[in-house]
Design a protein with these regions (language model features):
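N-terminal interaction modules that seed assembly of large macromolecular complexes
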Residues: 2-4, 8-65, 69
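Low-complexity intrinsically disordered segments
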Residues: 56-133
């Protein structure tokens, strides 16, 4: 699937949010936060895992390009000087708009089990490029 690096990173963040929902449990006077896993079929969980791996590799490529830009703009240093931050920001915006081809598994909307899984709309919006109705 062709997508920009920006949309790939957004999809990765959304997929990482599919591990579960934080829930507060009260035991007497004590509160504890636990992560309640979302309920997906085995096939959907595997599609999510495959997509995570593919998008993590894409993030790694983006990170290498980002680090190269930092070194190039800063003259070999690990941080961008204040007077060159605009140049760096412009280069990162250009990089984020570049297209990459990522092998992603499609997910069926019904398999997200939205009646049971309270996925935030922001997560759903980021997942839309991967979801078939």
């Amino acid at each position: 699937m062709k997508m920009t690096y920006a949309s790939a990173l957004e999809a990765l963040s959304a997929l990482e949010a599919l591990d579960g929902e934080n829930t507060i449990i009260r035991d007497g006077g004590r509160e504890q936060v636990i992560r309640k896993p979302y309920q997906f079929s085995a096939a959907t969980r595997m599609a999510i895992a495959r997509n995570l791996c593919a998008l993590q590799a894409t993030r790694d490529v983006f990170t290498l390009a980002r680090n190269d830009a930092i070194r190039r703009i800063s003259g070999g240093k690990s941080t961008v000087p204040d007077d060159l931050r605009d140049d760096f920001a412009s280069e990162m915006a250009d990089l984020a708009r570049q297209e990459t081809d990522v092998a992603l598994a499609r997910v069926i909307e019904a398999d997200l089990n939205l009646a049971e899984n309270r996925l935030p709309p922001t997560v759903l919006a980021a997942l839309l490029p991967l979801v078939d109705a």
